Amino acid sequence: KKDGYPVEADNCAFVCFGYDNAYCDKLCGDKKADSGYCYWVHILCYCYGLPDNEPTKTNGKC
């Protein structure tokens, strides 16, 4: 398992407007992660415990 910013089909991370932790936690759960939250510095969803084969970004939106 790994931690990171999950990406959409265009290789951009998921934006979480309004700092919506519930949105990110659900999104991460749908991707089989343990949990997730909205990282306020970048306004992007960050997941903990993603499967190793799930694409992620290490930094930046795209």
From Swiss-Prot:
- Tissue expression from the record: Expressed by the venom gland.
Keyword annotations: Amidation, Disulfide bond, Ion channel impairing toxin, Neurotoxin, Secreted, Toxin, Voltage-gated sodium channel impairing toxin
Q: Please give the positions of the paired cysteines in each disulfide bond.
A: 12-62, 16-38, 24-45, 28-47
Q: At what positions is Cysteine amide found?
A: 62
Q: Where in the cell is it found?
A: Secreted
For the LCN-type CS-alpha/beta domain, which residue ranges apply?
A: 2-62
Query: GO molecular-function annotation terms?
Result: sodium channel inhibitor activity; toxin activity
| A single Gene Ontology CC term | extracellular region
Q: Which domain of life is it from?
A: Eukaryota
Q: Name one GO biological process term.
A: defense response
Please give the InterPro entries that the UniProt record associates with this protein: LCN-type_CS_alpha_beta_dom, Scorpion_toxin-like, Scorpion_toxin-like_sf, Scorpion_toxinL, Scorpion_toxinL/defensin
Pfam hit, one: Toxin_3
As for what it does, the entry says: Alpha toxins bind voltage-independently at site-3 of sodium channels (Nav) and inhibit the inactivation of the activated channels, thereby blocking neuronal transmission. Is lethal to mice.
Please state which protein family the record places this protein in.
Belongs to the long (4 C-C) scorpion toxin superfamily. Sodium channel inhibitor family. Alpha subfamily.
**In the UniProt entry, what is the domain comment?**
Has the structural arrangement of an alpha-helix connected to antiparallel beta-sheets by disulfide bonds (CS-alpha/beta).
Q: What is this protein called?
A: Toxin Tb3
Species of provenance = Tityus bahiensis (Brazilian scorpion)
